[in-house]
Amino acid sequence: MTEQTPAAPVVRRVDPRHRYEILVDGERAGLTAYRDRDDRRVFFHTEVDEAYAGQGLASILVEQALTDVRASGMRIVPVCPYVAKFLKKHEEFADITDPVTPEVLEWLDGQLKR
């Protein structure tokens, strides 16, 4: 009998839902949510399902999401604490990162109340 190796996680951008999702064996294991403001992608929430905790999926998800932001020519605003923490450890994204300002927080609050 042979053991099946689990498939590598897949990250996809789901524009209608304003988020990136990470899939494991076709099942959504986590997400990072955003709203776009002009040329900036404002990340405000990241979560990984408890069943998938401890596998490094949040890091994979955020790294691939930020790589996609760079490829699209946009900038990052890390309102989400996890994304902010990730960026402190990964300086390769510093050139496309903007600070979180009161103006951005007020705008985001308005977006999320819709």
Write out the residue ranges for each language-model feature.
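Conserved GNAT-family N-acetyltransferase fold
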Residues: 32, 46
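Conserved acetyl-CoA-binding loop-helix of GNAT-fold acetyltransferases
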Residues: 54-66
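Beta-strand residues in well-ordered beta-sheet regions across diverse protein folds
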Residues: 23, 44-45
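A conserved beta-turn-beta hairpin within the catalytic core of GNAT-like acetyltransferases
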Residues: 36-44
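Terminal substrate-recognition subdomain of acyl/acetyltransferases
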Residues: 2-31, 67-71, 75-77, 81-114
